[in-house]
Amino acid sequence: MDLAPSIPTIEPAAPAPVKTRLRWGPWATLAWAVPIMVVMVLFQTLGALAFRTLWQHLHPEQVISIASLASNGAVLAFSVLVSAPAVLAVIGLVVRLSRVPLGDYLALKWPRWRDVGMGIALLAAVLLGTGLLADLTGQETPAFIADTFNTARMAGMLPLLIFSFVVLGPFQEEVMFRGLLFRGFAPSFGVWPTIVITAALWAIIHVQYQWFFMGEIFALGLVLGWLRARSGSLLLTFGLHALVNSMAVVEAALMASK
């Protein structure tokens, strides 16, 4: 009879499952971008039509034609208010499926002050340069910008227009172009090709402008893309984008006052 105390056998613990930190590659990112843009256009269209219907129900004497929707500031402001949450929700879902924290994936971190200063200086240089070139070539600011401001003011929706154009619109676009697309493209395509591609795509969606001003948007996109790569901060590019749009609102107000 064995009197030695029995020693219980301890089974080794199974290793905890490791979550795969998936990152969407360039083509998967581009594939996601298509339905996201569809959502943007769809919700902007639905928002514009819904606002037109509601407005004409409340003000039957004020007719908003289909042709004027693209330059009606109240309609545009409401359409951005409707579309931005939908677009941001879809992008949030895409990032969640990547299993990478949202802040890391989209570079949602505060920038350094020196990057802020450099960004302001570069944007000022681009805007001054394109402004001088516009004067030399006889380019005039599109008239629909003043129409957009006036129609929003007459509808009593100027605060909503400012919020949509200075906050919601820039944040939506930065999350899309310098956030989702930049993160998906840069590791495979390289930083500079990604800067150029995202700037070009960003300019293309502004089809309401003439070619000259689309070129200006492309140049701004190059600066914002470079700053995104240098600083690693999407909040920096959002703030600068909002600053540019604020200046555009001031310009629209000056045009409308003439």
Task: Place the predicted regions along the sequence by residue.
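N-terminal, membrane-interfacial amphipathic/helix-forming hydrophobic leader that caps
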Residues: M1-Y105, W113, V249-K258
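Hydrophobic alpha-helical transmembrane segments
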Residues: L30-V34, A77, W113-A121, P159-F163, ...
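Functionally important transmembrane alpha-helices
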Residues: M40-Q44, W192-I205, W211-K258
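Juxtamembrane helix-loop-helix connectors linking adjacent transmembrane helices
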Residues: T53-A77, R99-G169, P187, A253-K258
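Short juxtamembrane and helix-loop transition motifs at transmembrane-helix boundaries
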Residues: S83, G156-M157, Q172-L181, T198-H206
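Hydrophobic core segments of transmembrane alpha-helices in multi-pass, intramembrane catalytic enzymes
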Residues: S83-V87, L161-S164, E216-L220, L224
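Structural signal for membrane-spanning alpha-helices in multi-pass inner-membrane proteins
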Residues: V90-V95, T130, A134, F165, ...
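Active-site-flanking alpha-helical
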Residues: M176-F185, G239, A248
